[in-house]
Regions:
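Short, solvent-exposed coil/turn linker segments
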Residues: 19, 48-49, 92
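Membrane-interface helix-boundary motifs at transmembrane edges
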Residues: 21-35, 93-102, 166-175
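Juxtamembrane helix-loop-helix connectors linking adjacent transmembrane helices
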Residues: 55-70, 82-153
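Transmembrane helix-loop-helix hairpins at the membrane interface
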Residues: 8-22, 115-132, 139-245
Length: 245
């Protein structure tokens, strides 16, 4: 089973990460954040060679998850587990997370609108490319599971970049919200370099889209908090992986 192979592949890295964390003092939040982001990148990029997801061909970007609901469910639950773990073991990072700011309804609507804006450039490009050349159709029965992994997986990613990193920039470095959101987007794009050029051959397309999406999520975060940013990122990924575009 692929999910078993994936978990076995992660064990050495997770063991090393655990040892490193235990050697660090709880008062070293920046080192915690570096370790958490490294673990995320390693767990995300390990999905590709096993076929748990597919990301484009050549320089053309499209995304599809594996067509296995059990695997998608396990991956989504694992992402939530990582979020709970990080929040529990690094309280100095946890206090930096603002789940909502301002009007919640406006935040949710803005997060949804952000997802539409994020995928709009690719949607326009896709109009001239047959569906079978960009991942193919997706069974309707998988859509709830894809939505779950898109939201839970990107909660894991967003709490790192728009939760901890953004919070550190605004609270500790005293950077204003909008610049902090844009900086988080730059870091987010940088976190895709290995995926773009070493794990896949999609290259610059991944970095450009990650920068665009990351900056949008950062701007949403700067005004409305983390959950709306998760909606922007997670729903954008859902739209790209669902075959609905």
């Amino acid at each position: 089973m692929l999910i078993t192979e994936y978990l076995l592949l992660l064990i050495p890295g997770l063991v090393l990460a655990t040892i490193l964390f235990l050697l660090l003092r709880r008062t070293h939040p920046l080192l915690h954040l570096f370790l958490f982001i490294t673990v995320f990148i390693f767990t995300r990029d390990a999905m590709t060679p096993l076929g748990l997801w597919s990301i484009g061909n050549g320089s053309f970007l499209w995304i599809r998850f594996i067509h296995d609901p059990v695997t998608l469910l396990i991956l989504g639950l694992s992402s939530l587990g990582f979020v709970f773990l990080m929040q529990s073991i690094s309280p100095e990072l946890a206090v930096l997370v603002e789940w909502f700011e301002g009007n919640r309804v406006a935040g949710i609507l803005t997060g949804i609108a952000g997802a539409v804006i994020a995928v709009l450039p690719l949607a326009l490009i896709y109009r001239g490319v047959p569906l079978e050349n960009r991942g193919g159709t997706v069974p309707l029965r998988l859509l709830p599971f894809i939505l779950f992994i898109a939201l839970s997986g990107n909660l894991y990613e967003e709490i790192l970049f728009r939760g901890y990193l953004y919070g550190w920039l605004t609270e500790r470095e005293r950077i204003k919200p909008v610049p902090a959101g844009l900086i988080s987007g730059l870091f987010f794009s940088f976190g895709h370099v290995f995926l773009a050029f070493n794990v896949t051959d999609v290259g610059i397309s991944i970095l450009v889209f990650a920068l665009w999406e990351g900056c949008l999520a950062g701007l949403v975060r700067s005004r409305f908090g983390l959950i709306p940013a998760v909606l922007t990122h997670g729903l954008a990924v859902f739209l790209l992986t669902s075959g609905l575009l």
